[in-house]
Amino acid sequence: MARPHIEPFCDRDEAFKKLILPGLSSGMRYKMLSFDDDTGACSMTTQFDGGYKRAPGFSWSEWEMIIIEGEMKVGDQVWRKGHYCYVPPGYAMPEISSEQGCLALVMYNTGAPSHEESTEHHPLAQVNLYHSVDSFMDIPWAAGNVAKPSVASGCMIKLLNYNPRSHAMTFLYCMTPNFYQDNISYHDCAEEGYHLWGTSWMMQFGDVPTGGYFWRPAYINHGAFASEYGCIALGRTDSKLFNHFHYNPWSTPVQNADRSEARIYQRDPLLYKWAFSKDHNHPHGPEDFEDTMVRRGDEQGHDLEQFKTQGKTHDHWHGHDHHAPESEHHHHHHGDGEDHHHHHHD
């Protein structure tokens, strides 16, 4: 999903615009939250005006929606605040209307907003994937440890949608009053969030109030986190959510990505060798900045003055110099107690 980093942003600072697209009924207004220039996929705060009505039909894009305020009639059902739906491409929805008007968060995931009038599903539609639920009333809160390592206690979730192939998720999350988590996080996936109610605080971006929104591509630092009075928000990821926690606020997205790769190398060396190093029988692992960064306090014998003046040229306490001229490719691998010489042939 090629959307730029958007953070911080609050839709309360923007005015609604009329949504005029072929097939979509008049009476819709929107605030664009994020937009994919490649596919037309987008997330919008959408106002359905009083008296709005749309004929039965389907979209060429999968889409999701959660009601923020008001009521919407969908077929013979009435959806109220907190009602959520996931609609696969080609799934024909019944007539949609709103007598008094309705505010919703609408997300088109795989293409631009579209509507083809039809009372029948498209022949290729995966109709079994459709679902809707009153997320406020009919789903209990669960501990936020769906992803491990987990966030601090006091952050809870309700899982709304899950893709078993990509592990992409849509979920509600809440922070209890006085929630606090002091570390920094990044992920291997894009992450999206919209505050339905309440304010949270993030070290890099400040307060995120009601109507606050972010689209955060992979490997961007965020946190520490806090919420004085609590908040509730909708969150989404485009693949598996894994919390890479650390305490270095100056690491870059490139360094964070290298660290993620390093953790694969450390955790699954055979997988790493197969996936990344098919033509090299002794791969050198990528850098994990937490293993190499200079730390305050006990430096375990590192010559800090030499480090400061000569960059990475430094002697370790165990008594050898990686950069000595006579041992240009001489490495000591911690843990096996053996010296290994690597001969590189051109």
Segments predicted by a language model, with ranges:
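A short, N-terminal "cap"/entry segment at the start of jelly-roll beta-barrel domains
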Residues: 1-38, 114-167, 259-308
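Ligand-binding loop in jelly-roll beta-barrel domains
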Residues: 28, 78-79, 89-118, 189, ...
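Structured binding elements
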Residues: 65
